[in-house]
C-alpha cells in the first residue's frame, strides 16, 4: 500500500511519517520525500517514473508529498468549472495510481505557521487547491483521510 501524506507546509506530515516509521507499525516501510519545489513539467516526469517503479514493490510505502502538492502549490486556485476541469485533466494525465493501492492522508491543521511565511500571500489559494484535489480524489475512488496532525497517529 502507498500512504501519501499531503497538506500545507507546517502541518506535521514529516513528523507523522517519522513517528510512523519508528513505531514499526509496518514491517518494512519505505519513506519517500517528494519535493514540491521543482518545475511542474520536471515534477510530472519524475512522478510518472517514480510511481512506475514503486508500483513494482510489494511493501508499504510512506510518501511525504506527491504530485498533488506540486499541483496545489503551482497553480492559482480559481473557483470556476474550467479550472476544475483543468485540474481533473492534469490528474488524469499524471496520477497513475490504483485507488485500491493508495491512501491519501490530508493534513489540515497548521502546527508551525513560520513554515508558511514564504507562501503567505498564497495560502488560501493553496488550501483551496488541496480541498478541490481531495474532493476529486474521493470521486475517483481513493480513500482520503483528513488528519489534524500528530494526535491522529492512531490511524494505523
Curated annotation (Swiss-Prot):
Keyword Chaperone: no
EC number: 2.7.4.9
A Gene Ontology biological process term: dTTP biosynthetic process
Binding site for ATP: 7-14
Keyword Nucleotide-binding set for record: yes
Primary enzyme class: transferase
A GO MF label: dTMP kinase activity
Pathway connected to this protein: Pyrimidine metabolism; dTTP biosynthesis
Assigned keywords, A-Z: ATP-binding, Kinase, Nucleotide biosynthesis, Nucleotide-binding, Transferase
Catalyzed reactions: dTMP + ATP = dTDP + ADP
Pfam families for the chain: VapE-like_dom
Protein purpose: Catalyzes the conversion of dTMP to dTDP.
Family: Belongs to the thymidylate kinase family.
Protein name in UniProt: Putative thymidylate kinase
Amino acid at each position: 500500500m502507498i500512504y501519501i501524506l499531503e497538506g500545507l507546509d507546517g502541518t506535521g506530515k514529516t513528523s507523522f511519517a517519522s513517528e510512523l516509521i519508528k513505531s514499526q507499525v509496518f514491517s518494512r516501510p519505505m519513506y519517500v520525500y517528494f519535493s514540491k519545489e521543482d518545475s511542474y513539467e520536471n515534477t510530472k516526469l519524475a512522478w510518472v517514473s517514480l510511481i512506475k517503479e514503486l508500483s513494482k514493490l510489494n511493501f508499504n510505502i510512506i510518501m511525504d508529498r506527491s504530485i498533488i502538492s506540486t499541483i496545489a502549490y503551482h497553480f492559482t486556485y480559481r473557483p470556476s468549472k474550467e479550472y476544475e476541469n483543468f485540474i481533473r485533466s492534469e490528474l488524469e494525465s499524471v496520477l497513475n495510481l490504483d485507488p485500491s493501492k493508495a491512501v491519501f492522508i490530508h493534513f489540515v491543521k497548521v502546527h508551525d505557521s513560520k513554515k508558511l511565511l514564504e507562501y503567505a500571500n498564497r495560502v488560501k489559494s493553496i488550501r483551496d487547491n488541496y480541498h478541490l484535489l481531495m474532493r476529486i480524489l474521493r470521486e475517483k475512488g481513493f480513500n482520503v483521510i483528513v488528519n489534524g496532525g500528530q494526535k491522529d497517529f492512531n490511524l494505523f
